[in-house]
UniProtKB/Swiss-Prot annotation:
InterPro entries to which the protein is assigned, alphabetical: ConA-like_dom_sf, Glyco_hydro_7, Glyco_hydro_7_sf
Enzyme class: hydrolase
Function noted in UniProt: Has endoglucanase activity on substrates containing beta-1,4 glycosidic bonds, like in carboxymethylcellulose (CMC), hydroxyethylcellulose (HEC) and beta-glucan. Involved in the degradation of complex natural cellulosic substrates.
Keyword match Glycoprotein: yes
Reactions it catalyzes: Endohydrolysis of (1->4)-beta-D-glucosidic linkages in cellulose, lichenin and cereal beta-D-glucans
Keyword check for Hydrolase: yes
A Gene Ontology molecular function term of the record: cellulase activity
Record key words, sorted: Carbohydrate metabolism, Cellulose degradation, Glycoprotein, Glycosidase, Hydrolase, Polysaccharide degradation, Secreted, Signal
Glycan attachment sites: 136
Organism for this UniProt entry: Aspergillus fumigatus (strain ATCC MYA-4609 / CBS 101355 / FGSC A1100 / Af293)
Protein name (database record): Probable endo-beta-1,4-glucanase celB
A cellular component term, taken from the record's GO annotations: extracellular region
Pfam families attached to this UniProt entry: Glyco_hydro_7
Amino acid sequence: MAQTLAAASLVLVPLVTAQQIGSIAENHPELKTYRCGSQAGCVAQSTSVVLDINAHWIHQMGAQTSCTTSSGLDPSLCPDKVTCSQNCVVEGITDYSSFGVQNSGDAITLRQYQVQNGQIKTLRPRVYLLAEDGINYSKLQLLNQEFTFDVDASKLPCGMNGALYLSEMDASGGRSALNPAGATYGTGYCDAQCFNPGPWINGEANTLGAGACCQEMDLWEANSRSTIFSPHPCTTAGLYACTGAECYSICDGYGCTYNPYELGAKDYYGYGLTVDTAKPITVVTQFVTADNTATGTLAEIRRLYVQEGMVIGNSAVAMTEAFCSSSRTFEALGGLQRMGEALGRGMVPVFSIWDDPSLWMHWLDSDGAGPCGSTEGDPAFIQANYPNTAVTFSKVRWGDIDSTYSV
C-alpha cells in the first residue's frame, strides 16, 4: 500500500537546489517498521520510503525541458541557485515499481534490473526511510540501542551490494525557500565518501560541484558471498559541502571495516555456511556505550545473527577502539566516539542495491575480502547471468538492547 502526498506538500531535488513542486503527486511506498522496548515489546509504525531526488524528473516550469543535461545543470536554466529554483519544477513519482522498488507490509524489495521496452535497464534504486508524517526523514538515535532487520541476500551474486546503512542527513532534507521539496522528494543525501552528488546538493543547485559529506554507519554491505559492516566518522556534524582537496580529509571514507572472511573466518558466511545466505537472516547491530546509557560514549559495536531460532555471535572479536586502531584514518577523524556522537544526534536509514563498474566490488568480496573470482563482479557478467538479482529487507526494528529479537 502506498502513501500519496499532494503535490502541494513539498518538492524534491537532487542534492542541491530544490525547485518548485510540480503537478504530479509523490506516491511513497509504505514500509511498516517497529519501535521496540524491553517492557513494551515492539510497536508498529506507519513509515514509508522515498527515492533519492536524482530519480525524480526536474524540468523547466511550463515546459518539458529538463533542468539538467548529460554534463550537469543546464546553465541557461540554472546559472545560480536562486534562478534555478525559480525556473525548475520537480515532479513526484507515482509508480515506484518502475524504479525497482516493491513493497509489501513490512518488507521492501530492491531490484537491480528491469525489462523496459524489450531491453534490460539498470536501476540501482536508493531509498530513505521517512517518518510517519511522510514529510521528514526518520532520524534514529541509537546510542545504547540496537538496530535489527531481516534480509534475503540469496539473489545477490558476486559483484552486487544490497546495502542498509545510516546517514547523518538533515531530517527535513535541507528544506528551505530554495528547496521546498525537502525530504518528501528525497533531497539532502550525504555520506562519508564525500562524492559530488551531481546537479543537486541538499536540495539546491550544485553550481560549485561540491561533495556532500556526512557521517555514515554501514550496518550491512553484502551479497550472498561476503558481508561487512563499518563506521565512517567525520570531523563535521550533519551535511557539509566540501570542495577540492578537503573532500578527502573531512570523513573516513575507508572506515573501520569488519569482514569475517578477511579476519580468517572463511567458512562463516555464505551458502550453506554458519550464517547461511540461502535462507533469510536476522541481522542485529548493538551500539554499546561505556556507561550503558543513551548519553554515554560509544565503546563497542556488536554484531550477531539469528537463524532458525539460534543466535550466531561474531566470527571474531567485537568492534572496539582497539580493533579499529590499525584503520587508516579512523582514529584521527574521531573514531568510535565521533561516530557515537552522530548516532546520538540521529541518523537516517538508507536502503540500496548497486553494482560497481569501477572496482567490480572486489573490496567487498574478492582479493582477500571474499571468495569471489576476479571477473565475477563485472556488471556485464552479472546482467547476462543474474538478471533477476534483488535484495529484500523486512521487519526493520530498533530499540533497547536485546529487545528486537527472540529465540
